[in-house]
């Protein structure tokens, strides 16, 4: 795992401003899992933003950039054992703290998760570019996948799509020469 390959395109604020997590990422009542004072995090990243963008009480697909539901319910993540006490809200909470300069013993795991999801060789990044390619370059396809990638600070773009096509050709992937 290399931190050099960890470069989300969007800051936590940009993710929220774009429309993410159904507007309720930090609206879940999970105080029993944490004693962290979130006000510092909110002040650092979201100062001046409408709190309905991140503190809503109910998930609303209309709040998402792609106007679609994306992701699994919080309870599912807890059942899978993927939530840690330091960051009980998950990857995005960790990204907020990491972006503030806070480091912890979960950094390598979280960076690896990002790389596997949205990094250059990430599963979902590959998935969306393959869908775009197979749809005759319809960039409106795969809204749920694109929304999920946005949650991880990644937005599909022409430059990365061209790189994906080049890498796929070299590796004998879905694109034939």
What are these regions (language model features)?
Residues 106-114, 130, 139-143, 164-165:
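Short glycine-rich, low-complexity/disordered patches
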